[in-house]
């Protein structure tokens, strides 16, 4: 589908295990369920939507680099890379594409090492602790922001 805007969703390590990985924290929906729902919401909003999940940091970085010039907004759940990846931070700084950081769980109510993010201060916004709804809220915010400023 050709849309007015292109929004890219990136999901980091272990999110491919949603539905079976700690469902009391992350819920019972699979990543495919979440991406299908978000894809439909994007279609209804008239935007082009693409997605990549990877457990490999370099694949996420390469996808961020290839987004330059053809992507208007990034939604990213960096998962564990949130707390460790200066490289993801640098990639996002390099391409200068606005992004929203998403977390299913409230990272601030979890272990202390999860409280720090290398991305949050660069993000347009951060959504955490709202489960799967956080993805929909992020998509809606991105569409609203793109419509307002373009």
From Swiss-Prot:
One biological process term in Gene Ontology: aromatic amino acid family biosynthetic process
Protein origin, superkingdom: Bacteria
Keywords from the UniProt entry: Amino-acid biosynthesis, Aromatic amino acid biosynthesis, Lyase
Active site feature: 26 (proton acceptor), 103 (proton donor)
Keyword Zinc: no
UniProt EC number: 4.2.1.10
Record GO terms (molecular function): 3-dehydroquinate dehydratase activity
Cysteines joined through disulfide linkages: none
Similarity annotation: Belongs to the type-II 3-dehydroquinase family.
Xref: InterPro entries: DHquinase_II, DHquinase_II_CS, DHquinase_II_sf
UniProt xrefs under SUPFAM superfamilies: Type II 3-dehydroquinate dehydratase (SSF52304)
CDD domains named among the record's database cross-references: DHQase_II (cd00466)
Pathway connected to this protein: Metabolic intermediate biosynthesis; chorismate biosynthesis; chorismate from D-erythrose 4-phosphate and phosphoenolpyruvate: step 3/7
Identification of the protein by name: 3-dehydroquinate dehydratase
Function statement: Catalyzes a trans-dehydration via an enolate intermediate.
Catalytic activity: 3-dehydroquinate = 3-dehydroshikimate + H2O
EC primary class: lyase
Subunit annotation: Homododecamer.
Site for Transition state stabilizer, residues: 21
Annotated positions binding substrate: 77, 83, 90, 104-105, 114
């Amino acid at each position: 589908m050709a849309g007015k805007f292109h929004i890219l969703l990136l999901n980091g390590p272990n999110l491919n295990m949603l539905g079976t990985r700690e469902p009391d924290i992350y819920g019972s929906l699979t990543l495919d369920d979440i991406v299908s729902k978000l894809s439909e919401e994007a279609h209804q909003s008239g935007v082009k939507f693409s997605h990549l999940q990877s457990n490999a940091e370099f694949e996420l970085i390469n996808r961020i680099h290839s987004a330059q010039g053809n992507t208007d907004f990034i939604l990213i759940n960096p998962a564990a890379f949130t707390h460790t990846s200066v490289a993801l931070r640098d990639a996002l700084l390099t391409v200068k594409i606005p992004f929203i950081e998403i977390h299913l769980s409230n990272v601030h109510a979890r272990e202390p090492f999860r409280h720090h993010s290398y991305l949050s201060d660069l993000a347009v916004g951060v959504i955490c602790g709202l489960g799967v709804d956080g993805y929909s809220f992020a998509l809606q915010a991105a569409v609203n922001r793109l419509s307002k400023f373009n």
